[in-house]
Amino acid sequence: MDQNLEMNKKKFFSKILLFGEYGIIKNSKALVIPYKKYYGSLKFSSKLDNVQKDSNINLKQLSKYIKNNEFVSNKINTLKLDSDIENGLYFESTIPESYGLGSSGAVVAAIYESYKQEVGIDLEINDLKLILSNIESFFHGQSSGIDPLSCYVQKPLL
């Protein structure tokens, strides 16, 4: 019997954003609150079902994007990420997609947490937000970084 293994025990929660992403991109303020009803985490399976395969393929595309992004390519261990993807890595999530609840932010936070190059180094919050926004831009074209930052620090942000 195939066993799905969690990569780590950390869950990355969805979020509730008051005042909207577009406003943040245009330098307005917003309040972001972690919403623990929905969450996601990285897992492995040696026999991926269709949903897990889709996630695995999406992670492959994200890894390729990271490697081609000059700003973040040296901040993520893509060799390890690619190896894990080939070994059945996927993102399991209860976060509804396309509703603005932070499904892409949770994926980005999980990837950064698990594959960041600079382990043990505390970055300034704005530096971390910039890294996460660059990675999340894979999903949306332009990201403020507030969604993955909220998922990563798991605290309300203003």
Language-model segments: residues:
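ATP-binding N-lobe of GHMP and related small-molecule kinases
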Residues: 2-100, 113, 117-121, 154-156
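Conserved acidic
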Residues: 103, 124
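Short amphipathic alpha-helical face segments that pack within enzyme cores
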Residues: 106-113
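Alpha/beta catalytic cores of group-transfer enzymes, especially the acyltransferase/condensing modules
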Residues: 125-158
